[in-house]
Each structure stands twice: as C-alpha cells, then as structure tokens.
C-alpha cells in the first residue's frame, strides 16, 4: 500500500513539498522532496509505517521538521484533498467529506475493491491526525459523469446495471 502527497501554498498554488510513502504495513519507504531552496530531500528512507496513520504522521513530521520542513506548524494546513478512485453515480464533482460521504464511498467498495477501502483508510487516518481540518474527496469517476447512457452501458444484462451499478465510468479523471 502506498500514499502519494503534495503540499501546496493555498494562495499561490506553489508546490512546497511532495513525496511518497511506500510499503505501508510491510517495511516502509519514505520519500520527501521539499521544493524550497536549502531543504534536504529524503529518498526511499526506511521508516516504520505499520499503518496509514503512521505514514501520514511521517509526512506531517517531515513537513514541520525544524531543519527541512516547509511549514512551521500543522496549523498551517487549511484543508486536505483526497483522490478517491470510485464515487459511482453518487458524485459528479468533488465534495467536502462528511459521515454521509464516507458511507457513500464505502458503498462503492464493490466497484473498486482494491482502491476505495484504502482511500477510506487514508481519509480516516488524516481525520485522526488532523482533527477539525476540512477534508475533500476528489473522484476519478466525476470527470466522466456527463457520458450519455449509450456510451456508459455495457452489452450485459441490464440488471447488472440496475442491481450492481456495473457500467463504464471512465477513470483517471483527475488527470484531465
């Protein structure tokens, strides 16, 4: 399991830092790339990350590190955006995450069993370590919500769509 992250300046859109937590739950590799001059990069450093909560804490620790951090305090984090693979037909745009949104994402787990459960773990881990910070879900499937039925219906029995929402959704919408 992995976690990609970026920290942006909300006023200018400037990239402050980015990186990757890999092998969460196994042996943990942490990459941190601050974009400010004079800050030291960490590349695939061994860091214990038994859960997503520890991975997120490693990211936050790097962001506020006295020597190589790019912000002074976690209080500077105004919001967190989460890429969520599957929003089904429930979400045609990005949304502020509420308990109802979490439930709707969970309801889409059968449509993205490898991704949505991990997305939910990441969201809940962020909520745990950044309580009170607004979280936003950005859905890969939202970009393609304007497809007409003739484009998204598969040549399968219609009951698969009615009962299980099996249809073409289109993915990688956050790349467009």
Model-inferred region functions:
Residues 2-49:
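Short glycine-rich, Thr/Ser-proximal phosphate-binding strand/loop in the N-terminal lobe
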Residues 11, 16, 74, 130-132:
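Short, well-ordered coil/turn elements that cap or connect secondary structure elements
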Residues 13, 26-29, 102, 110, ...:
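Short capping/connector residues at structural and topological boundaries
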Residues 15, 49-53, 57, 95, ...:
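Electropositive phosphate-/nucleotide-binding environments in soluble metabolic enzymes
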Residues 41-46, 104-109, 162-166:
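Short glycine/proline- and acidic residue-enriched helix-loop micro-motifs
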Residues 41-73:
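A structured beta-alpha segment of the ubiquitous adenosine-cofactor-binding alpha/beta core
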Residues 63, 67-115, 136, 143-151:
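Short beta-strand-loop/turn "lid" adjacent to the catalytic site in phosphate-handling enzymes
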Residues 116, 120-176:
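ATP-dependent carbohydrate kinase catalytic cores
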